[in-house]
């Protein structure tokens, strides 16, 4: 008799995705972050659901309702901080996951890669709208500044911004719709993640060498289930250390001041995980140019499969590309630092140099390195 997990219509799907899935025998810990992202998403949906039970999306009571959650709701403080810091863990995993894809040439799976880019945009939109909900100073001014960027679009810009706001400024209508979108988008993300996995399982996972591993596959369970559990435990440990010892480490003190449209904070900045893009936006003096650079800083990922010039898929055996990859990582860290600094010398110049370097590395230097490495192979 066939095992029920192989015959039952529902269990069969789970079996083919998480139990009997043929996986390469040599994938490293960099491959753990997909499952960690799944755990982060589940955790964010669960904590978010409980927060939504007590939150009110009204400008008069939103700030107080968050304070009420932290003070009066049973374990409300831990739910709130798990949700806020869970977003940070989500983005750490997300950026490592994308970085792994870049390093090992996983972008060769075009459908998986492109859905991943759509997922990245959706998660960023969700996180941005979530940051607006506590209705502190940085929530309000962040929402005002970022939505205002759309006014740079010629002809329809101003109309578009007022349409998103639901009025002539960020107000009650904006907060209500942001809450509605912030609630629904994680479920859209979950559906997209399902499609992401569906396309990945059509081809099978890549591996560090970038060479086909069809002749050497092992079952996902127990080998990678146990490996993923270790990753999950480390993720939860890190998150709990953050939540229980310094929950406000990654937040902005300005967000503990209720939103006031008449008082602008000295430095308006988004959460740390958007600072690199914010730095690129600010480094261009023209508004429309800045907005285009901001969008392209993420959308450039879609060009990466077209810019692949090397005969090898992975960077494992390509030292020049490796140097450029880690330069890119250092450059992104520099941009993240600059995004949190005031707009004054020398930060302006550092930001502009780092922005130019970011686009140069991806569009020019890395493809050229691939061609050089192809020639080195002939020697």
Curated annotation (Swiss-Prot):
Belongs to the cytochrome b family. It comes from Lama guanicoe. Its cofactor is heme b. It is a multi-pass membrane protein. The chain crosses the membrane at residues 33-53, 77-98, 113-133, 178-198, 226-246, 288-308, 320-340, 347-367. Heme 1 (or BL or b562) is low-potential and absorbs at about 562 nm, and heme 2 (or BH or b566) is high-potential and absorbs at about 566 nm. This is Cytochrome b. GO terms for cellular component: mitochondrial inner membrane; respiratory chain complex III. The gene is MT-CYB. Component of the ubiquinol-cytochrome c reductase complex (complex III or cytochrome b-c1 complex) that is part of the mitochondrial respiratory chain. The b-c1 complex mediates electron transfer from ubiquinol to cytochrome c. Contributes to the generation of a proton gradient across the mitochondrial membrane that is then used for ATP synthesis. PANTHER family: CYTOCHROME B (PTHR19271:SF16). Heme b b562 binds at residues 83, 182. Heme b b566 binds at residues 97, 196. InterPro entries: Cyt_b/b6_C (IPR005798), Cyt_b/b6_C_sf (IPR036150), Cyt_b/b6_N (IPR005797), Cytb/b6-like_sf (IPR027387), Cytochrome_b (IPR030689), Cytochrome_b_C_euk/bac (IPR048260), Cytochrome_b_N_euk/bac (IPR048259), Di-haem_cyt_TM (IPR016174). It comes from the Eukaryota. The cytochrome bc1 complex contains 11 subunits: 3 respiratory subunits (MT-CYB, CYC1 and UQCRFS1), 2 core proteins (UQCRC1 and UQCRC2) and 6 low-molecular weight proteins (UQCRH/QCR6, UQCRB/QCR7, UQCRQ/QCR8, UQCR10/QCR9, UQCR11/QCR10 and a cleavage product of UQCRFS1). This cytochrome bc1 complex then forms a dimer. GO terms for biological process: mitochondrial electron transport, ubiquinol to cytochrome c. Its main location: mitochondrion.
